[in-house]
Design a protein with these regions (language model features):
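Contiguous, amphipathic alpha-helical segments that mediate oligomerization or scaffolding
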Residues: 2-47
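Intrinsic disorder/low-complexity polar-acidic segments
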Residues: 49-136
């Protein structure tokens, strides 16, 4: 019984550490993307850091918002934009390694989920609230 508790505690510590890294990296990406679209492409965007668990980027002209929410207890990251909804969860695989699941519009997406896919989802969500043409 102690071995099970020890394994669960170790897995929780791994998930907590990976989740904290993802929160930091994704938050940085949200800030960079909002700044890039505002300064380089003229999008009327405003970043709102509600707290460390919720960030939103708002189109100041239309009021449309993209939100990025972090649930540290469940190790879930939710990314929403106009017509965009992704959910990522930090899990421990059967082999005891940290991994991720990804759902798009509530449906589990098969295949390998990477940090790059999470950052792409952030870009898509923020880009979805602008009226800018897609870059060539």
């Amino acid at each position: 019984m102690r071995d099970v508790a020890r394994t669960e505690a170790r897995e929780l510590a791994i998930k907590d550490e990976l989740f904290a890294h993802l929160v930091e990296r994704i938050t940085e990406e949200v800030r960079e993307r909002e700044r890039h679209l505002r300064e380089q492409r003229g999008a009327p965007l405003v970043l709102h850091a509600h707290d460390s668990q919720l960030y939103s980027v708002e189109n100041d002209k239309t009021g449309r918002q993209a939100t990025i929410a972090f649930d540290g207890l469940q190790h879930i990251i939710e990314v929403r934009g106009e017509g965009i909804h992704y959910t990522f969860e930090v899990i421990i695989s059967d082999k005891g390694r940290p991994s991720f699941t990804m759902c798009k519009d509530g449906e589990l997406v098969p295949g390998t989920v990477t940090q790059g896919k999470m950052l792409t989802a952030v870009h898509l969500a923020i880009d979805s609230i602008t009226d800018l043409p897609a870059p060539i």
